[in-house]
Amino acid sequence: MFRNLTLSLADITGEDYIRGLVEGCEFFGTLSRGDADALAHEKISFYPEAVQRRNDELAASVGRQIVSAVNDSNGGAPTDAFRHAENRDASPLGAYGCYRLGEDGKLYLIGKSEHYHASLGHSFPGYRLVDIARRLGVPNATHNNTRGYITRLCEKR
């Protein structure tokens, strides 16, 4: 089993930053001080044992037909070169952990980086921290000359 981290936004960013977020929520009227503080300190389990077990169980189903295939002729509007290279059968219909259900109804293993989050897996429970940050008013703008606290913190780590 993997070591499961359980952290809050406050654990990651520190109390000084959280105090500013909480006061900002109160000023903007988006959350009460108490609600904002509770959200900032909510512990999120990054990779709970139940998720680990489910990922292990799904391995036996890789390559098998799981759901009915999507029989849709929607090819979008790609370039000819892209249309020739794409694999619509494997296009994601749904995903969980390191698995993806293709439009052909088969289960695929993410065996290589499909995107930046592949190492975390689809539906990574730790993404709840992003939802919490958004509710607390953390902006997602990260312009070069006004990089936010969290961006600067990540640069150092």
Give the positions of each predicted feature:
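N-terminal glycine-rich, Lys/His-bearing helix-loop that initiates the first secondary-structure elements
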Residues: 1-157
